[in-house]
A protein has these predicted regions:
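A short hydrophobic/aromatic micro-motif that marks alpha-helical segments and, especially, helix-coil
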Residues: 17, 45-47, 60, 175
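Conserved GNAT-fold acetyl-CoA-binding loop/helix
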Residues: 33-55, 66-68
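Short loop/turn motifs at secondary-structure junctions and domain boundaries
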Residues: 58-63, 146
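Acyl-donor (CoA/ACP) binding surface of acyl/acetyltransferases
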Residues: 1-33, 37, 67-183
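Alpha-helix initiation/capping motif
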Residues: 42-45, 59, 130, 161
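Terminal output helix/cap of sensory domains in signal transduction proteins
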Residues: 55-58, 114
Length: 183
């Protein structure tokens, strides 16, 4: 991929995480919601944040994953990324810091990333996965136009036994309007 791409929205700047973000990433990843609903290590150590920032840079260089720090006027608000980019598809993932939730940041940041995925990246399909019960993440995906494709029984590895996971998909040709989900 090469040089990291900066995305801007009305209120946010999305840019590659850098070394100066390590302390904020470490602090935010102490949140039990982030640890239970994402793939971050649990417990989360400062070294995990350091490794993540180094990996994010490597992923950008090779184009396998594109991860952006979500930044508002106050600083780091969360992360959003396109993971496992291959054969015209990727997985959309995101988390928000507790203090950034409830402001519409997830919708704003993910919309910018989806636009980039289907625009300049020319991807054909995005997938979204979440632990069954992560309704906040589900609302974001549903409002982006993702269609719920089912439940993957024991489909997600976490910080203990495997858990059931929702899976949804969005094609470049799909309408980007909220979809009805039975959840």
């Amino acid at each position: 991929m090469g040089e990291p791409v900066v995305l801007r929205t009305t209120r946010l700047t999305l840019s590659r995480p850098v070394d100066s973000d390590v302390d904020a990433i470490f602090d935010e990843c102490q949140d039990p919601v982030i640890q239970s609903f994402t793939t971050v290590p649990s417990p989360y150590a400062r070294e995990d944040a350091e490794k993540f920032v180094a990996l994010a840079s490597h992923w950008w260089d090779e184009g396998s994953e594109l991860v952006w720090a979500i930044r508002d006027a106050a600083g780091l608000a969360g992360m959003v990324g396109l993971h496992r980019i291959k054969d015209g598809a990727a997985e959309l993932g995101y988390w928000l810091a507790p203090g950034a939730r409830g402001r519409g940041y997830a919708a704003e940041a993910t919309t910018a990333v989806v636009d980039f995925a289907f625009g300049p990246l020319r991807l054909e399909r995005l997938e979204w996965h979440a632990v069954v019960g992560n309704t906040a993440s589900a609302r974001v995906a549903q409002n982006l136009g993702f269609q719920l494709e089912g439940i993957r029984r024991r489909g997600l590895a976490g910080h203990g036994p495997r858990v059931d996971g929702w899976i949804a998909g969005l094609l470049a040709t799909d309408p980007r309007t909220p979809q009805p989900w039975p959840v």
